[in-house]
Regions:
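N-terminal Sec-dependent export signals
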Residues: 1-66
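Pre-Walker A (pre-P-loop) alpha-helix and adjacent loop at the N terminus of AAA/AAA+ ATPase modules
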Residues: 71-113
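Walker A/P-loop
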Residues: 108-145, 172
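Conserved C-terminal "switch" segment of AAA+ ATPases
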Residues: 139-144, 226-232, 238-239, 247-292, ...
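Walker B catalytic acidic pair
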Residues: 182-184
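Canonical AAA+ ATPase core
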Residues: 186-192, 200-248, 265-266
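C-terminal engagement/docking regions of AAA+ P-loop ATPases
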Residues: 309-343
Length: 343
């Protein structure tokens, strides 16, 4: 009985947790003392596709396939992030020119489409990753341009033999699009635990980046120092990731703009006094921020708490007109800024 026959029989009725262990048995040669390496690799891919199609991933794997609209316009419409927009535009221009040279039969420079995004939480890394995927589709780099968002929990298993198939199944979903790994540095804990499953996930990702070099773009993201440690931890990562984009924290004025963006989307307005108070409070938050400052997430949280404060204020009033229902006052904003979460 050959490896494939044993594998197919073993998969019938197997749960997701059993697949990784079964694959491990094959690899170490229990069923085939001298397995053909090419055959084993082929089976790994088939197993990953079975996991992807027949099982549910954890909540830490998010599919973003909204591909409508102009990605360049969406990039321009983002609040702040001037240097980020410039970097993405520069990358797009370079790729476009290389495609033109290729079409004319000229030599082309080698382009690495994989990216490192570093910056604090809430600075737009995930949003820009989605836009980059769509730009790559527009340029003909990717067929679909969708984004699969994940993190350590979405890639690593809890037991021996789970991580490889689990990581593979996420990669299969990302083919022809972008695999976005948030807090990628968590795959390499400080101190470099030798038996950590994160190392297995990295090895699998690097292998698939080579196998699917024309179908997969990987973007890794996280804090600057931690991401540098992550890249430096593995020569394979160093050779594949050589373009870095820095996402700066938002200014107080930019956070005010983000707050007002949520207001506009939800049909709210500010009183004149509240307008001044809003800017002062965001300036204060930026001046007193720590490493975990939430940036745009913080602005969204303040907005959500402010409209809750307004609802509490107006709950017992009668005959509410549109002005009262839409206007946020200083007292409402005080309720919004009351919590120091993510400051």
């Amino acid at each position: 009985m050959d490896i494939k026959e044993v594998t197919n029989k073993g998969l019938k009725g197997c749960g997701c947790l059993s697949i990784g262990f079964f694959l491990l048995l094959i690899v170490i040669g229990i069923f085939a003392p001298d397995p053909d390496e090419e055959e084993v690799e082929k089976l790994k891919k088939e197993l990953a596709e079975k996991v992807a199609s027949e099982t549910e991933q954890k909540d830490t794997v998010v599919v973003n396939d909204v591909l409508e609209g102009d990605p360049y316009q969406e990039l321009d419409d983002l609040i702040g992030l001037g240097s980020v927009k410039e970097e993405v535009r520069s990358l797009a221009n370079f790729v476009k020119l290389q495609k033109e040279r290729e079409a004319k039969g000229l030599k082309t420079a080698k382009v690495s489409y994989h990216l490192v995004f570093y910056g604090s939480p809430g600075t737009g890394k995930t949003t820009v990753a989605r836009i980059v995927g769509r730009i790559y589709k527009d340029l003909g780099v990717l067929k679909k341009g969708h984004t699969i968002e994940t993190d350590r929990a979405g890639l690593c298993g809890q037991y021996v033999g789970q991580t490889g198939p689990k990581t593979d199944s996420v990669i299969v979903k990302a083919l022809d699009g972008v695999l976005f790994i948030d807090e990628a540095y968590s795959l390499v804990p400080e101190g470099g635990a030798g038996n950590d499953y994160g190392q297995e996930a990295i090895s699998t990702i690097l292998k698939r980046m080579e196998d699917y070099r024309d179908r997969l773009v990987v973007i890794v993201a996280g804090y600057k120092n931690e991401m540098q440690r992550f890249i430096d931890s593995n020569p394979g990562l160093q050779s594949r990731f050589n373009r870095y984009i820095d996402f700066p924290d938002y200014s107080g004025d930019e956070l005010s703009q983000i707050f007002k963006m949520y207001m506009k989307k939800n049909q709210y307005t500010l009183s004149k006094e509240a307008e001044t108070y809003l800017k002062e409070r965001f300036d204060y938050a930026v001046a007193h921020k720590d490493r975990n400052f939430g940036n745009a997430r913080y602005a969204r949280n303040v907005f959500e708490k402010s409209i809750q404060a307004q609802a509490n204020r107006l709950a017992n009033e009668k005959d509410l007109d549109k002005d009262k229902l839409t206007e946020l006052t200083v007292d409402d904003l005080k309720g919004g800024f009351a919590s120091r979460a993510n400051i």
